[in-house]
Amino acid sequence: ERVLPGADRMYPDTDSAPIPLDDNYLNNLNKNLPTDVIDNYKILKEWGVNEEVYTYIFSKNLFPIITKIVDKIGVNPKYVCAFFGHEVKFAVGHYQGPEQFNFERIFKLFKYLKSKGITFELAEKMLPELIMHPQMDFESILTSMNFKKYSKKEILSKLPLLNEKFSEGKEIISNIKRKNWVMGKLRNIAIGNIELTDLSKEV
């Protein structure tokens, strides 16, 4: 409705009355606003995240991506924060790509690994290629790394022979040394196929 000039005219520079905003529209706007840093800090504390990674997370505005990985993929938040604060920080600082690294690719990487039944520990080994060759797809990165899928049963089937090999010529066998040696031999085929903590319990 056209508003006539006069004392009752609220907006002199317009001819129409203001249109009230829908509540849903306002709520959607609020969802897109950045959460207060103090609130994010409290969430990191609740997750039990080591404070040494806070600065990197906030300086690179990684909190939204971290919560996305936690909420949509179901990865342990403490692990995700440590991954960004240590592994990603190191890789970005040591490997040079043709363009600035897009941290959103980490979300896509975790999503891909979960869809393929590959443990997230392999993500660390994939980071250099991810940074240096941003256009390379994840399947190609795995191929370049010579990654092969092994079942837990296949990996554990190698234990008897490795234990026998370690024990050869030894009168006294240190269980700690044996375990470390076997873990070292199995590490390359285990990463991505079985959690190393789970493998350690079996060894």
Q: What does each model-identified segment do?
A:
Residues 1-203:
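Charged, compositionally biased, marginally structured helical/coil segments
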